[in-house]
Regions:
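Metallo-beta-lactamase
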Residues: 36-38, 134, 141-234
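Conserved beta-strand hairpin/beta-sheet module of binuclear metal-dependent hydrolase folds
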Residues: 1-51, 156-167
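C-terminal regulatory/interaction regions
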Residues: 236-280
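Well-ordered beta-strand scaffold positions
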Residues: 10, 27, 88, 133, ...
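Active-site HxH/HxHxD metal-binding segment of metal-dependent hydrolases
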Residues: 38-135
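Short catalytic-loop micro-motif centered on adjacent basic/acidic residues
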Residues: 30-33, 57-60, 146
Length: 280
């Protein structure tokens, strides 16, 4: 595990979820998306210790535990760290049991709770809710940008080095080619956010999930691939609904026609995205 420099004071640490690190002049740091709880946060902290970096702030781009789950472990290690998120996604971070209810579409069950719930997620508290716009931390300015779609409260962080951390607005090309029926809450907002990203001035983009840092030029190609994936499923679902179908039959067709991997958890994620498409 390494601290990889993107530009200036902006770094990231690769992982299943990439973690952004912005280092201030006093060698304290802002962490963007600490990732899942477990062994990885301990390794991240070891890397930071080796570089004499003390974490002072955490910003979570959205309320999914693969991005915010390690907050408590960072809080235990760095006692005075300030944990932040959007106001909307604060609800899900502080009440992780709501996510399984949302995914199931009603009262959840023990099986789903056991898949999604982790004891290390208990009692995460958001110290400060943040809004879109200029945002000052430790005498330096950041841009907080709303990118709704994946969740209602998704945000991105743009550093003064012109590096943007977009959470799950985009995923890496290597992942998108395998899993193109993405987990989305609001299709129209996702389209709006993808178009919005095209007009933002940045030099480098760090994905929540993906192996490479993306240049501004390459981001256009990746944005179009995401838009095309959306169009693909919108077209398929419209075609399938020429004749009335139940939600279950429609979902079965989508899974089978696209050879989507399917287990209990993925089934409910696909169903949630399908409902979002139908709403759109």
């Amino acid at each position: 595990m390494n601290l990889t420099k993107v530009k200036g004071n902006t770094f990231f640490i690769k992982g299943g979820t990439n973690t952004g690190i912005y280092v201030f002049e006093d060698n304290t740091a802002l962490v963007i998306d600490p990732g899942l709880c477990g062994s990885r946060p301990r390794r991240v902290n070891k890397v930071l210790d080796e570089n004499n970096i003390q974490v002072r702030y955490i910003i979570n781009t959205h309320g999914h535990d693969d991005h915010y789950g390690a907050c408590n472990q960072f809080k235990e290690y760095y006692k005075d760290v300030c944990i932040m998120s959007s106001e909307y996604d604060k609800l899900y971070i502080e009440n992780p049991e709501l996510f399984s209810k949302y995914i199931v579409g009603g009262k959840s069950n023990v099986f789903m709770d056991n898949i999604l719930k982790n004891k290390m997620l208990d009692d995460i508290k958001i110290d400060k809710s943040i809004e879109a716009g200029k945002f000052e931390l430790n005498n330096e300015m950041f841009d907080i940008i709303e990118f709704q779609g994946h969740t209602p409260g998704s945000i991105a962080v743009l550093t003064k080095d012109n590096v943007i951390f977009v959470g799950d607005l985009l995923i890496g090309d290597e992942i998108l080619s395998k899993y193109d029926f993405l987990f989305l809450y609001d299709i129209q907002e996702q389209i709006n956010s993808l178009e919005k990203l095209k007009n933002i001035d940045f030099e480098y983009l760090v994905l929540g999930h993906g192996k490479q840092v993306i240049s501004k030029e390459d981001s256009y190609k990746l944005i179009e691939k995401h838009l095309n994936a959306l169009k693909k499923y919108l077209y398929q679902i419209r075609e399938l609904l020429v004749e009335p179908k139940s939600l279950e039959i429609l979902l079965k067709n989508i899974i089978n026609n696209n050879n989507l991997s399917n287990n209990y958890k993925e089934y409910h994620f696909f169903k949630s995205s399908l409902v979002s498409v139908i709403s759109y």
